[in-house]
C-alpha cells in the first residue's frame, strides 16, 4: 500500500522547510506519496481559504497542516476547514499551540507542538532576508540535533503505519526538552546536557522575541531585544553541534533512516548497516 499524505504549509516555523523531507530523506521511500501546497510566508484567513481546500484534490489518507501559532486567525480558520473535511488531519505548530490543545481535541484533530521552535524577531530594523535565513538555519540545527525532528519523524511514521493497517490514530504530542533528547538517545551525559541546554535556549528565544515584537513599542528598546534573541539561537545551535560532536567521538550517534520497504531502521556504529 502507498499512503498518500497531503501537507499544507502556511507561514513558516523552523520545522516547515524540512517537514516533508523528514518522511523521505533520500527520495526513495516506496510506501508514501506526498503532495505539498502552501501560501508562502503569509497565513491570513484569505490565504487559508484558498490553500486548504486544494489538498482535497489529492485524496490523501491523512493531512498535515503546519504554521506558526495555531491560535492565530488564519491557522484557526484552517483548523475549522480541516475539521469539516472527511480526512484525518494533524496540526503542527509552535509553543502558542499549547493553549489550543483542548480546541483541537474538540475539533477531532491531532497535533504535534514543537515547543523549541521559536518565533523569529520580525522587526524590520533587524530582519532582512539574510537574517531570516540565518535564524532559520540555527533553529533547524537545534531541532535536528537535539532530537525534536526525530520525534516528528517517529510520530508521523506511526500515523503512516496506522494508515497501512487501516486504523489511523491521531497523535497528541508536545515536544518538550525531555521528549526531544530522549528521541536523540544520547549516550554521553555531557552531550545530553548540551542538547538540553540548546533546546531550553530555543524556547527562551520565543519569549524574548514575543517581548520584542509585541510587548515593546520603543524602537531603541525593541531592536536590541530581538537582536539578543537571534544571538541566543546562534549560541544554541553551537551547543547542539557540540552535543553531536561528543557523540561522534564515541561513535554513538543514533541514525534512524527509512529502509527499503519504508520501515524505520536504526544504527549507531557509523561503519555498519542499519537494521
Kindly label every feature range from the protein language model.
Residues 1-60, 67-73, 77-275:
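Anaerobic metallocofactor- and corrinoid-dependent redox/one-carbon enzyme cores
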